[in-house]
Amino acid sequence: MAKERGRRNLKKIKESSQSDSLKTLKADPSPSREAAQIDVNTFFGLVNSEELDYFKQAESTLNANAFENSEERQGFVSSVFEEAKGKELKLVTNQICSKLMERLILNGSDRQVKRLFKAFNGHFLSLAVHKYSSHVLETLFIRSASVIENELLNNYQEEEAEEEESDEVFATMENMFLFMLAELSSSIQKLIVHQYGSHVIRLLLLIVGARELPSSIMSNSILRSKKSKIARKMIEIKDNQDSNRAYQVPAGFKNELQELLGLIAKDKDSKQLRELAIDKIASPVIQLCIQLEGLVDKDRTIWTTIFPEVDDKDPKEEAFVEYLLSDPIGSHFFQAAIKYQKPKTVHRLYDLYIKDRLLKLAKRETTGAFVVKELLGKLKATDVTEMLDILIPHLSELIENNLEIGQAIVDASIARNNYGKEGIISQFLKVFNDANVLESVLKLSTSTLGNTKNDWPTAEERRCAIFLEKLVEYDDSFLDAVIAALLELPEDRFIQMCMHGVFSHVVESVLVIERVDIVKRRRLLNIFTEHVVTLSCNAYGSHIMDKLWQFSIKLNLFKDRIALALFENKDKIKDSIYGKLVWKNWSMELYCRRMYDWKNLIKQQELELFPDHRGAPTLLKKRPLEEPKKVEEKKDKSRGRRRYH
């Protein structure tokens, strides 16, 4: 009998073992998918044609929001609530009427929310697994969290007259909420793998965990599915002030959180929880459980069941980690899960399964690269510098199709006193040296720049712009490259960039007086001064005009030309809400009425920025017969700006 080979044969056996484990993961159907078929009644009757016409018109009226005041709107909402009384269940399960119910919840009073909550008692499970009513429940639960906080703070905003006229007696919102939790808890293991019910469970976990409740329309929201977020934008259902914030909840909600997490993990071993972690429906729920369990469980039962704390490699765990690093759903789970773990815990997984093939994983741009990016911000300094030593020499390859990994490497370098900066710069310059950096990074030729259809900037454009801004901030060589590329653009294209919702931020990022030499400042200002009015009256260009107040220091000829253009077109400037802010931030009222004071303001600005400059001009003196007036220091009038709309 032939002698078996040594290490090579062992390697084959090991690979075969891992392959079998991976096949098992891939071959298994979604966990408990058949069990997730919840047998409940979701039919509560049909809305007749007359009712449908009335409620459809009411939905349109609320959407138009053409009420003269809030009292008129509240009166209309109350009348629709009254008309819907006794019909709530069939309305929330109707496609058109469910949108109306969401609007009523968003505009209703605390008492009206309680009345609706009471109408759903005993039917929450049925509503949670229905395509339309599940969305209504999510909106209702967010409003309920607001009411619970009001009750805790004794901050009731109900009209006393309404309570006196009504004979209805309601329990506290807290008790009603707990009663609903009890109804859903019995089916929670089926709900977490249900197409609609899983979203409801995610929201409930956030509420009882006192975490921020996300927007239902933002692209990165964990509250709704992608289709739901797009649909809500199309039908113009906007969140009220209750979203995008956390609420105070009773202390007893911690016990509810602990109970919910316990029910989700009940009777589940590593294999079953791992199946849930890679299931496209259940995975976001398990991510959230891992995020929250540290609040009530020091042992972090769900995490340690999925990733047992052992010192050596485990073939099954190794196969599972490999699947996570090669699967889009799995990599998203892995990235989100390690974000909330201690560096020591994450180090074990990195050291056992990732370190030896870090570069290979970083090249998996749709899977493993996201985990590598998270590790760069999570691990200890020694691990991160080790990662940088491996990744930096190959940075030019990595960013060809994945700019985000480049940004993560730059962030990691900055966080560690610019570790490996020279290598990073040389790698980036390999890519951008022989090409226009704006085209290489922003892909201007295929972007929404210059579109006349009011296209929103794409998510890809936002990512590319943020990456380029990061490079400009990182080193002057990138700043110079971007300025050179801007100056090479046709003038109309340059101005289009200044008025673009995303690319205008890139232009703003180079307008830093301390880093740009005077020759380049003159060349840029030459272009800006020809388009003062256009930029001032634009939502994005007006921010660039604000920055030019400081960018034109010691180039007073350009500052005067800009001020003169504003003055000569003051009617048009003042008619624009954006132009008014530019007018204010350039102190144009002072320019019109007290030119000496305006000139002195400029001199003070120069002295503040260059206090040690020899031969700095002195403040202009007033006319002899006028009473001297002290020039007040210019206050910072910079206005807030959202980061990409």
Swiss-Prot record:
Its main location: nucleus. Pumilio repeats lie at residues 83-118, 119-154, 183-219, 259-304, 316-351, 353-389, 489-526, 527-564. Residues 623-636 have a biased composition (Basic and acidic residues). Residues 1-11 have a biased composition (Basic residues). It is found in: Nucleus, Nucleolus. Residues 1-33, 619-645 are annotated as: Disordered. One of its GO terms (cellular component) is nucleolus. Keywords: Nucleus, Repeat, Ribosome biogenesis, rRNA processing. Pfam families: PUF_NOP9. PROSITE patterns: PUM, PUM_HD. One of its GO terms (molecular function) is mRNA binding. Transmembrane segments: none annotated. The keyword Nucleus applies. GO terms for biological process: endonucleolytic cleavage in 5'-ETS of tricistronic rRNA transcript (SSU-rRNA, 5.8S rRNA, LSU-rRNA); endonucleolytic cleavage in ITS1 to separate SSU-rRNA from 5.8S rRNA and LSU-rRNA from tricistronic rRNA transcript (SSU-rRNA, 5.8S rRNA, LSU-rRNA); endonucleolytic cleavage to generate mature 5'-end of SSU-rRNA from (SSU-rRNA, 5.8S rRNA, LSU-rRNA); negative regulation of gene expression; post-transcriptional regulation of gene expression; regulation of biological quality; ribosomal small subunit export from nucleus. RNA-binding nucleolar protein required for pre-rRNA processing. Involved in production of 18S rRNA and assembly of small ribosomal subunit. Belongs to the NOP9 family. This is Nucleolar protein 9. It comes from Komagataella phaffii (strain GS115 / ATCC 20864) (Yeast).
